[in-house]
Amino acid sequence: MIVLTLAFCISAVGVYAQKADFSGKWTLDVAKSKLGERNNIETQTLTVTQAANDIKVDTATTRKPPAGGGAPGGGGMGGGGVMGRGGDGPATYMLDGKDVKSEIAGPGGTMVPVTTNAKVDGGKLTLSRSTTFNTPNGAITATSKEIWELSADGKTLTVTTERTSPRGTDTTTKVFIKG
């Protein structure tokens, strides 16, 4: 009987893990999040659409005005968006675990190569990204890794992000509420 119960519990966890669906509209709970010193996010919303082979994330961010006044701006390059993009807007990730190479708009109207990777493992979604761009001081590489986790009831999404750049490593934890 114990073996049967254990087998049922393991299979139930496996079914949940395989069906983890991050779709929905998610609103950042700033009070529950650990955003770090460099983040000036006032509000952030993720609109997520997940299919069998990909996940689409549309990010919208409102920022606090800079210290000393000035306009708050949108996404910018401040590192607040999903995948450390800083910017807002849509992004699509393939869920097959393979690297996808593309280009994004960089400084001064240049195009910057970026490599993304996404996979669902159990009830977690891992999004990785690497960007290398040239500056007058040489090439700079920035990487980020996000781990998305749903609460048991599917109403809370926790996104832990680690970014590495010439500035060092920065880790944030964002808590989003569905609805």
Model-inferred region functions:
Residues 16-179:
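PEST-like low-complexity, intrinsically disordered acidic/proline/serine-rich tracts
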Residues 2-12:
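Bacterial N-terminal signal peptides
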